[in-house]
Amino acid sequence: MSTPARRRLMRDFKRMKEDSPPGVSASPLPDNVMVWNAMIIGPADTPYEDGTFRLLLEFDEDYPNKPPHVKFLSEMFHPNVYANGEICLDILQNRWTPTYDVASILTSIQSLFNDPNPASPANVEAATLFKDHKSQYIKRVKETVEKSWEDNMDDMDDSDEDDEDDE
């Protein structure tokens, strides 16, 4: 059934395929356009550089009038990310407007890697280290970057096994 939300999500998907912003990718699940997998690559010249961070975006029928529920699936050590992966970002709450699309959501999240907001911490430990002990903060972030590589390699191994099951 085609609804305004589903039509908009198909437009968002077309845009992501044709003109994806650097360092982000996203696509709906094959059987559900309302649920998307996404990935953000850590930007250069940040402690997150070259990390591969997976996210889940869940939309409801009120999209684009309401923001999606977005969370990191990859472990993330960041002042604005809760332990459960949920993200403290104004455009996902009180500053949402229907002009935002999947690409702009992901680039806004990616910009948090460059510019964390320790004044509005979701992770108090990360915010404190970011403000007061930058070298310890960077060390912890680099650990999550390495873990992101391991997790993605594990996922690739799992998908290889799935492919073998199909044969």
Swiss-Prot record:
- Looking at its record, which EC class is this enzyme? transferase
Enzyme Commission number(s) of this protein: 2.3.2.23
- Provide the protein name: Ubiquitin-conjugating enzyme E2 2
* Region (Disordered) location: 148-167
State where composition is biased (Acidic residues). 151-167
Function summary: Catalyzes the covalent attachment of ubiquitin to other proteins. Plays a role in transcription regulation by catalyzing the monoubiquitination of histone H2B to form H2BK123ub1. H2BK123ub1 gives a specific tag for epigenetic transcriptional activation and is also a prerequisite for H3K4me and H3K79me formation. Also involved in postreplication repair of UV-damaged DNA, in N-end rule-dependent protein degradation and in sporulation.
Which parts of the sequence belong to the UBC core domain? 4-150
Q: Which residues form the signal peptide?
A: none
Active-site residues per Swiss-Prot or TrEMBL entry? 88 (glycyl thioester intermediate)
Q: What GO MF terms are annotated? A: ATP binding; proteasome binding; single-stranded DNA binding; single-stranded DNA helicase activity; ubiquitin conjugating enzyme activity
Keywords from UniProt, A to Z, are: ATP-binding, Chromatin regulator, Cytoplasm, DNA damage, DNA repair, Nucleotide-binding, Nucleus, Sporulation, Transcription, Transcription regulation, Transferase, Ubl conjugation pathway
